[in-house]
């Protein structure tokens, strides 16, 4: 216990009986920690999970009904008169983007993959893109549609493409559009988004499905990789420069069977972390950044400035209408 922490109270879950509660109450009283309530063990509080943790919110059945059930349990088992005042949000401080001047240049829309297969996104990234004149435009690879024509760049976030690998492989218009886009415009892909760029992706049952065939790898189920990572670029790239260091997060259960040659020269960076052997990782090409690692763009505005500069450069170099 850290004595500098001000513990205002605790809520305990999975309490099975009045005796169980009394035992917990006795322990907390001796510690001087207020007990704000005990939630029972009940199916109403259970959430479905899969190989990376909880199932995403959009897959839950009737979320409104769940919230009502949780509210009823809270009224029955929690000291809301004490708990609610403790949960009041503090006074809002300055905007996290207050130190970042907004863009005064032309609007440069950015397509962002957004559907049941691709939805691991930091909200602040979208807010920062808006702030810097790069409004996000949703694109659904699952819907078998072309990337929006107005997009000057493409972001492929993480998600669960392995769960939808068969449907993605049949979305031929999406895959053709992606291949064409990668030849003309900047593309940023991380984790599940990167898997869309490979030759093949194995689904949850181990069946392989063709992907966009932009990068020379096949992806299949592997061991869990999770944790914060220290990243050192091997050379200058779309968003990074040699000699810099970045921090990111890795979280996946798929692995790549890499087919690029030893002298390919496209490795993005050296990746290191706690109990992780340093290794080369990712792809670094003139208009492509692809990696397992999630970056929080709002924590390093340089990334977003470089992204905008790349969009503007490529937009000027292409014929009008492309």
Where are these regions (language model features)?
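Internal gly/pro-rich beta-alpha loop/helix module
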Residues: 1-102
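Cysteine-nucleophile active-site neighborhood
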Residues: 160-237
């Amino acid at each position: 216990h850290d004595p500098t922490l001000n513990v205002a109270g605790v809520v305990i879950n999975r309490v099975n009986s009045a005796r169980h509660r009394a035992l917990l109450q006795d322990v907390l009283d001796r510690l001087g920690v207020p007990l704000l309530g005990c939630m029972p063990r009940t199916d109403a509080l259970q959430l479905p999970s899969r190989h990376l943790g909880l199932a995403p919110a959009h897959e839950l059945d009737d979320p409104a009904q769940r919230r009502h059930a949780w509210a009823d349990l809270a009224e029955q088992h929690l000291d809301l008169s004490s708990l609610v005042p403790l949960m009041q949000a503090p006074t809002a401080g300055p905007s996290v983007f207050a130190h970042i001047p907004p863009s005064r240049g032309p609007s440069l829309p950015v397509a962002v993959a957004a559907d049941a297969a691709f939805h691991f996104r930091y909200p602040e990234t979208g807010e920062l893109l808006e702030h810097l004149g790069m409004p996000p435009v949703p694109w659904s690879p699952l819907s078998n549609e072309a990337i929006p024509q107005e997009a000057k760049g493409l972001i492929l976030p993480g998600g669960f493409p392995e769960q939808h690998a068969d449907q993605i492989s049949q979305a031929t218009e999406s895959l053709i559009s992606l291949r064409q886009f990668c030849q003309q415009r900047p593309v940023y892909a991380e984790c599940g988004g990167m898997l869309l760029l490979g030759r093949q992706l194995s689904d949850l049952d181990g069946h392989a499905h063709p992907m966009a065939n932009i990068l020379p790898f096949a992806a299949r189920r592997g061991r869990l990789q999770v944790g914060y990572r220290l990243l050192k670029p091997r050379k200058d790239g779309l968003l990074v420069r040699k000699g810099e260091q970045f921090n990111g997060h890795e979280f996946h259960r798929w692995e790549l069977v890499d087919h690029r040659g030893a002298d390919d020269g496209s490795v993005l960076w050296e990746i290191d972390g706690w109990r992780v052997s340093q290794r080369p990782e990712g792809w670094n090409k003139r208009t492509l950044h692809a990696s397992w690692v999630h970056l929080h763009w709002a924590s390093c505005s340089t990334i977003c400035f470089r992204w905008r500069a790349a969009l503007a450069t490529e937009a000027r170099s292409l014929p009008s209408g492309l």
